[in-house]
UniProtKB/Swiss-Prot annotation:
It comes from Solanum tuberosum. Its main location: mitochondrion. The chain crosses the membrane at residues 42-59. It is a single-pass membrane protein. The gene is TOM7-1. The keyword Transport applies. InterPro entries: Tom7. Forms part of the preprotein translocase complex of the outer mitochondrial membrane (TOM complex). Belongs to the Tom7 family. This is Mitochondrial import receptor subunit TOM7-1. Keywords: Membrane, Mitochondrion, Mitochondrion outer membrane, Protein transport, Transmembrane, Transmembrane helix, Transport. Disulfide bonds: none annotated. The keyword Membrane applies. Seems to act as a modulator of the dynamics of the mitochondrial protein transport machinery. Seems to promote the dissociation of subunits of the outer membrane translocase. GO terms for cellular component: mitochondrial outer membrane translocase complex.
Length: 72
């Protein structure tokens, strides 16, 4: 790695440390976003049908469970 020349050598070293911290935070945010998306996908996959049944059972007129589950 090349060393910076001139009076700003300490400032350049501090900037390198800041860039490292920003990179770590960026990586953390990316991993957290991926984890959140995976969990949301699973929740949506297993929760959609029960949600539809619950909404249907609370509607007026109240249908029977067989009417909710039948495609017709």
């Amino acid at each position: 790695m090349l060393k910076p020349k001139g009076k700003n050598t300490k400032k350049a070293a501090a900037a390198d440390e800041d860039d490292g911290a920003v990179a770590v935070v960026g990586k953390f945010v990316k991993e957290w976003g991926t984890w959140t998306a995976k969990k949301a996908k699973v929740i949506t996959h297993y929760g959609f049908i029960p949600l539809v049944i619950i909404i249907g059972m609370n509607s007026e007129p109240k249908p029977s469970l067989s009417q909710l589950l039948s495609p017709v």
